[in-house]
Amino acid sequence: ILKANASQIPLNMPHQYNLNYAPHLGMFKALAGNDPIDQLNFMADQGFKSFEDNDMRTRSVKLQEKMTQTMQQRNLRMGVFVAHDIAWKRPNLASGDVDEQNAFLKEIKASIEVAKRVNAKWMTVVPGLKDFRQNIDYQTVNVINTLKKACDILEPHGLIMVIEPLNFKSHPGLFLTESPQANSICKAVDSSSCKILFDVYHQQIQEGNLIPNIESCWDEIAYFQIGDNPGRNEPYSGEINYKNIF
C-alpha cells in the first residue's frame, strides 16, 4: 500500500477471510508506521490471522520475543522466514562444495532456534545460482544431497523448509526456477521437511500453465505466495486469474 493511497483506506474494517492470508511485514507501513509491533497489531485489526517476515532470522532476539508476545496476544501465526543467506551471486548448493554445504547447514541449525522462538513452522530455502561449470544433473544431485542433510536436522523438530523457485527475469542464473523441477527435487529428497513454496507471481513469469502445475505439484506444495503480473502488485490488478486459481 502506497503512502499516497493510505488516507483513502478505512482502518476499522476487520474481515473474516476464507483463506489464511499472511501479509508480509512492511506492507502496511503507510498505515501502521515502521514499528513491527504496530504493524502486527494493524494486521490483526484488519482480520488477518497470520503474517510472514523474510527478515525474521536477522532481527534481534529481543525484537523476536516481543513480536512473539504480540502474536500470542493477537492470535497471529508466523508464516515463512528465510532460513539462510541466499547466494544470489555464486553457486553454493548446486556446486557440491563442502564448505558451502556446511555453511548452509549451520544456518539451518541456527534457524531452528529462531523458529522455536517465534513459533514458526516453515522456512524458505533458495538453492542459489547454477554452477555453469557442471552438468545440470550433477548440480541437481548436489542440491538433493544437501537438502537431505538439512532434513535430517529439521525433521526431529517438525519444521519444514520450503524451496522456492524464482523467475529468470527477476533473478537470472538461479538453479531453481520451475515448479516441475522443485517437485522432482522434493520427491527425491522424500521428507516431510522438504516441500515447495509455490509463488504464483514467479511461476506466471517463468512457466505459466499455473493451475495444471499446481495440481501436478499439489502433494509437495506446503505454502503459496501471491502477487499479480506485471509488477508484483495486488491480485486482480494484472493478468493472473486469481478467482480461478483460488
Regions found by a protein language model. Name each.
Residues 15, 93-195, 205:
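Active-site acidic/histidine proton-transfer and metal-coordination neighborhood
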Residues 50-51, 162-163, 197-200:
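Generic enzyme active-site microenvironment
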Residues 1-120, 191, 207, 219, ...:
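N-terminal pre-domain/capping segments
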Residues 66-75, 146-154, 213, 244-245:
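Catalytic-core regions built around general acid/base machinery
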Residues 192-203, 221-225:
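Aromatic- and acid-rich polysaccharide-binding/catalytic face
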Residues 55, 167, 202, 231:
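Short, glycine/acidic-enriched loop or turn micro-motifs at the edges of active sites
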Residues 32-36, 40, 64-68, 140, ...:
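Distinct, well-ordered alpha-helical segments
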Residues 228-234:
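Active-site clefts of carbohydrate-active enzymes
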